[in-house]
Amino acid sequence: MATIKDIAKVAKVSQATVSNVLNGKDNVSSDKIRRVMKAVEDMGYVINEKAQNLRKGTAKILAVVVPNLYDKTYIDFFSSFKDYAERKEYTVDLYITNDDDDYERKQIQKIKSRMTEGVAVFTSISDGSEAYYEAGFSNEDVVFISNKQPYNCKFIGYDNIEAGKEIAKKILQGNYEKVALLTGPLTYSGKMDFRNSFLESIVKSDKISEVYERVTTEQCKYQNVVRVFTHMQPDAVVTDSISLAQTVKSVYQNFYRNKPVDIVSLSPVYTIPERDIIRYEIDYRKMGIDAASYLINRNWENRNELIIESKGFSDWPKINSKNEENVLNILSIASPTTRALKTVVNLYEFNTGIKIRITESDYESMYKLVKNRGAELPYDIVRMDKDWFPVLAKSVFEPLTNIESNIGNSLDGFLPNALKNYSYLDGDIYALPGTPSIQLLFYRKDLFEDTRLKRLYYEMYKKSLEVPKTFEEYNRIAYFFTNEFNNESPIKYGCSFTSGEPGTVGVEFLMRYFSHSKRLFDENGNILLNTEAARDALRETKDSWNYSSKIEHNWWTDSAWEFAEGDTAMGIYMINHVSGFVGPDSKIRGKIGWSIVPGDNPMLGGSVLGVSKYSKNKDIALDFLKWISRDDIGTATVLLGGMSAKKSAYDDAEVNDAYPWLDYAKKCFKNAQTDYYPIVDGDNIGLKELQNLLGVAVKKGIMEHLDIDEILETAMTDYENLKKKKL
């Protein structure tokens, strides 16, 4: 086996240099780093992590202890815990106890031997706190989940007593006479609290004629479920875990379907509905995040417990349709959100009997159709680009207050300024936010953190390789990562650039312009292109194009996919086009970071949803818009690859596990650039028209290598001609 001494000899450096390189220190030249890493690879050297941790005095290791990994409760907790911890550069070890207290005691010794800094545990030991403290862990090192311990300890859980009362209340509201209660071992305090609370609430009522109780382990759950059905024909079965509920469902559907049975259960959160189980939901993903956050930050100060508010019963109610023969026709821009919408509407059809027909159109074709046909569009609902909204809304949409006068009173829970930017026009509500989107900078975190590349960048520029805050920095880094200009770069292109359509080139210019100036027009409607801000933005646009692949991508989805293929260092994208970054074909999963765009003045994008003036089903169309704007539907849409305007979707732990940049994006909406264009005698100059004319001038100038002032003069002339047409 190769040693550090062997590596040093092959790389022709000192052993101290090898040690510095392996420990990620940046005080070594890029050439020596390259030689050391090549020797490491050629000789198959494996770093001794335990020895490395001993030298550092810390291991940055956390542990999660769970009974099993087939119950979604523990899967949700562990996945969120692990994602959070790994983003903080911690390693997470998983230990499975199979609900065996003796086996868990043995695992505790292994956990301690790994120099583990903190443990989150669903313990199987009745006095688990004592067992962990005896092994050498302090009160601060272990957080117990769901089940409180007899000793003073850190604890995260939910209100088991309240959950028992709420499920009992649900049972008493139903037409049930015979009820079965199936729980796990009552040696756990949380399960005992739930059981006692449920039964105490039930016995106070005379509505239930019989309650049959069974206690089971996971290993015996099938035979105990069978005992329930052979003892009685229950009207409802209550369980304290989703695993037991799914077992009840399986046994019932296969062997006892002669009589309807409702299954009511404590459950982790399901973003996508489960129709066969009535679920009282607990957010174990949030518990996982909170547990990891505590163990890393130790920020609880004078408290010992955190009680998570239960989400309660999942609410997917049936909607009473005014006419089950109705069909709603929807016209939509083709996008990932439209694909998600096609799936979500199946639930609406199931619950209402109303058929939904969605017609997709590409961006340019739909713009021409909507602009030319206006109110004559043969659709009930139109999903149009946010940029068209100020110009086309009044000719296409029925004001929603004409359909429901107090509609504004029911619009809550949206992202900051979403209603202002996506719904209101001249003081009236013409649409609901469809898919609010915002620009984010995405970059290859693995490359930005590579020790050799960081050193090489410093040697070239005498500056640290950091996430760019200006487009000058952005282009310097893009140049560095473009292999054509720097053969030390491991990838081909420094940045992406969407240049296939004039409108997208216009956006490339505008995002850079708005990093220098908040306004593109003066108070008289004159375009501010004869300015240093415009000249700087155009230079930066031309440079960025030079550091890109120069492939003429027609839309943001195409350039985002190029980034996902792994040959580009960074790019700026609207967040409604980037779900592919974590897709099965992505080569950058787990390798990306994200930040506010350079200049801290991002542009908005996305779509709005409105009721067509043509529609003969305006009431039903508005009901659909309100349904699609619900918190639960919004969260499901995002999880399926779309976007939502609801804050709850961005706060959902499962959504943030899937698309971890969304929590950050939510905070950026308040900084978004919205003052794009002026009013000319009461008529808006549409942003699409503005982007197109800018894009035509900029693209022509780049391709033909025109002088910067000449390009800007062309754009100003085109704008003045457009303004005259409006007048």
Mark where each language-model region is.
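N-terminal helix-turn-helix/winged-helix DNA-binding helices
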Residues: 1, 41-79, 88, 113
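N-terminal helix-turn-helix DNA-binding module of bacterial transcription factors
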Residues: 1-58
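Extracytoplasmic/periplasmic substrate-recognition and gating elements
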Residues: 329, 584-650, 674-680, 696-699, ...
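Hinge/lid segment of periplasmic solute-binding proteins
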Residues: 386-440, 591-595
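Glycine-centered hinge/linker elements that transmit conformational signals in sensory
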Residues: 475-481, 512, 516-554
